[in-house]
Regions:
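Positively charged, small/polar-rich N-terminal and surface patches that mediate targeting and assembly
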Residues: 1-105
Length: 105
């Protein structure tokens, strides 16, 4: 296993339904997430042509989870979100990571 000091740090963001946030937090914790924040919100998009085009549903209550994880763990988390929670399909959730180095400059 690679030394943690040489691994790249990722700012991982997960957007999910509020009723799934505890499961997501457990997953983040199992993969050494640090400085984890949860923000609850309600979307402003009304169901219409634009919403249908992007596959948005009527459930506007969301949780936005941000955490810092090593790149290897970020990949594992996203893989689990795709396999266990079908994040690779519409109306299930969104997850993405940004390299922290890119945020510094």
């Amino acid at each position: 296993m690679e030394n943690k000091n040489t691994q790249r740090l990722i700012n991982l963001t997960i957007i999910c339904k509020v009723n799934e946030n505890e499961e997501m937090l457990k997953l983040v914790s199992e993969h050494e997430g640090h400085l984890t924040n949860v923000i609850y919100g309600k979307g402003s998009c009304k169901k219409g042509a634009l919403a249908q085009a992007f596959g948005l549903d009527d459930d506007y209550k969301k949780a936005v989870i941000t955490t810092l994880v090593y790149e290897e763990n970020a990949t594992k988390i996203i893989d689990k979100l795709n396999s266990l929670y079908n994040f690779n399909k519409k109306n299930t959730g969104i997850a993405f990571g940004v390299l922290v180095e890119g945020l510094l400059f």
